[in-house]
Every structure is written in structure tokens, then in C-alpha cells.
Amino acid sequence: NSLRGKILRLDVSKLKLEPDIIAYGIRNPWGVTIDSKDRMFILDCGGAEIEAVYLLNDLYSGIPVNLGWPVFEGSMRIKKDPLMFKDVLAPIFEYNIRPGCLTAGLYLDDIESFLFADFYGTIRLLKQQENGDWYLIHEYKQEESIWGFGLDKKTKKIFVAPNNLELEISVD
């Protein structure tokens, strides 16, 4: 009955908080963001091998989504237990952990793309294809660590913390 490794929804308008489990089987979610379509992107730091980005398309289904930990790290099976963790959601993107450590993500409605970064300075941009698959369309490496993103919706500028780098992104 532990809440470890889970993402919860809490209705703060109720006198008694009863957590609604949205997802479980998560190792170390450093970044979580919800887009204008109520989809949740989860950046899950791996243990030894894989950094993974997950997409939950329906936050209100009432059925928790299984992301696979501790049997899976991303899409890689790390434990052999056929009874544990059936129906595991596959990540929309993953990469080898060295170097890595996912820290920040931001869905960009204007260009229908997901921007994310890791602590070691790599910024990546994903785009969804018509068949639903996601693919990497851009990767940029900078010298400094990245802790988070901020979007100025009026100017459409993206700011990167902690160094206040400004990004301008367009997808043709």
C-alpha cells in the first residue's frame, strides 16, 4: 500500500484527501508536465542504463498506468519475473544514461513538439508522427547544466535555467 513510485492526483477541494493513482512503476520522475490536451509527459531518470520519456494520454480514465519499474528500465527488462508488471506502457523516447539525467520538459503547443533536457546540457526536441510514434527532430549540446525551462507565452521565448539562456525554436 505504499505510495512510492506513483504519481497521484489529489482533489484539494475535499475535506479528506484521497489520492487517485494515475501511474505507478516509476523509478525517479524528475520532470512532469501537462500539455493543453491534458496529456502528461514524464521524464524518468533511470537506475543504471536508460533515461525514458513517457506519455500518458488519458489522465482521467480511472485506470492507473504501469510504467514498469522495478522490472523494466525504459523498455529494457532488468528483472526476470513473468508474473510482475503486465501491460507496461512503453516510453515514447529513451536513450542510454551515460551521460544523462533528465531534468526538464515542456510541450510546445505552437509547434506540437516536446522539448526536454538533461542535467549535462543536452536539449532534445521530439515530434509526433501521424501514426502516433515520436521521433527526435533536433538535439543540441551546450556546456552548462540544465535544471528547468520556462516559456513566455507572449513573446514565445523559452528560458533555460540556471543560466537564463534564451531559445528560439521552430519546426518546418
Residues covered by each model-derived region:
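C-terminal, surface-exposed recognition/capping segments
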Residues: L125, E139, W147-K153
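Blade-level signature of beta-propeller repeat domains, shared across WD40, Kelch, NHL, RCC1
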Residues: G148-D172
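Beta-propeller domain segments
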Residues: N1-Y135
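Short coil-to-beta transitions that initiate beta-strands within beta-rich domains
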Residues: R98-T103, K141-W147
